[in-house]
Amino acid sequence: MSLMDPLANALNHISNCENVGKNTAYLKPASKLIGRVLKVMQDQGYIGNFEYIEDGKAGVYKVTLIGQINKCGAVKPRFAVKNQEFEKFEKRYLPAKGFGLLIVSTPKGLMTHDEAKDSGIGGRLISYIY
């Protein structure tokens, strides 16, 4: 049986590993989208280092956890969001204003919702983290 949503599976695995108190998480299968989401999470200080490990199949990401994640998950369906509509989705997915972030796929690549607001562009919601 094939995996339906690798990104949702990876984010759920990270959240579960954080709840249990593990220091590392191994995300399999690896993809470019998962790597870009991990890069945004690393830039914002939610995870430590991560590395791609080739296993002869789909690859694995080894993620170092630093205990900063309360919850993270994928947004399904991937809503199209205009620049002015981010606040509506902040209320829906984040516990408080200014706490946590939404990861958005824009024409300029993956970025946080704050960066997208500052750039004046919209996109599709990929995931949330706080």
UniProtKB/Swiss-Prot annotation:
Part of the 30S ribosomal subunit. It holds the Pfam family Ribosomal_S8. The gene is rps8. SUPFAM superfamilies: Ribosomal protein S8. GO terms for biological process: translation. GO terms for molecular function: rRNA binding; structural constituent of ribosome. This is Small ribosomal subunit protein uS8. One of its GO terms (cellular component) is ribonucleoprotein complex. PANTHER family: 40S RIBOSOMAL PROTEIN S15A. Keywords: Ribonucleoprotein, Ribosomal protein, RNA-binding, rRNA-binding. One of the primary rRNA binding proteins, it binds directly to 16S rRNA central domain where it helps coordinate assembly of the platform of the 30S subunit.
